[in-house]
């Protein structure tokens, strides 16, 4: 019998596996083609140099694949470190940093002047074209002051606590993002906003990401965290929730602590027009790609 395969190279299983993965990603790329995906970047992923470089490459890949990624970043630990270096004591209430005039200036410096530019540089180094913004640029995030309700045990009544220059989005003006996206540039946004009377406000990054995702009609909002996602009473990951189910879990006490404001952001975003939100484990390598381009996912998906 003649050797018809003479000279043929044996198949490399690892190369075939890579080809299969790329092929399986095609329908997901088609689903998100020219769609906006907002990624809130923070936590361990942002503090780890290797994960940070991988994150930048993944975001550039999204852009090359036809998606329109928008990155919104946090920076709480870096702000705390700078305040400590300057001898300024940090105070918190309900997870929010009480922010006086001196503190908000440092917050803006760290978020918009340091962290933002580092992320932009990483994206550009990975072969992308990125530009850094904060909510003050183009009046992107118009902010209003936040007052926090606290229970006074002596009078047994709720009082309003003045958090200083801590705000929340009142309005998003997305025109500047439309212009940037049409130029094939990746916007990187620091969560600093400006009030109608010109004051600068420190805003929670999850909240800013959610408001921008709703204003842009995003297909997905991804919140990178340092946890696996939303956990049930048995401690196991809940892979998917409807808005109604998420509200029920908060009401019955299954969800507590820092996960509550994240779920509230998810709910508001979905009700505001975002197709789905994912609380994503940012410690997982290539978590963004796994979530968008495979059936695997890496967290909890919330949708209507």
From Swiss-Prot:
MF GO annotations: acetylglutamate kinase activity; ATP binding
Pathway, per record: Amino-acid biosynthesis; L-arginine biosynthesis; N(2)-acetyl-L-ornithine from L-glutamate: step 2/4
Subcellular location field: Cytoplasm
Enzyme Commission number(s) from the entry: 2.7.2.8
One GO cellular component term noted in the UniProt record for this chain: cytoplasm
Swiss-Prot/TrEMBL site (Transition state stabilizer) positions: 40, 262
Bilayer-crossing regions: none
InterPro entries documented for this protein: AceGlu_kinase-like_sf, AcgluKinase_fam, ArgB, Asp/Glu/Uridylate_kinase, Glu/AcGlu_kinase, NAGK-C
Residues binding substrate: 75-76, 97, 202
Domain of life: Bacteria
PANTHER family with a match to the protein in the record: N-ACETYLGLUTAMATE SYNTHASE, N-ACETYLGLUTAMATE SYNTHASE, MITOCHONDRIAL
Family listed: Belongs to the acetylglutamate kinase family. ArgB subfamily.
Primary role: Catalyzes the ATP-dependent phosphorylation of N-acetyl-L-glutamate.
Protein's recorded name: Acetylglutamate kinase
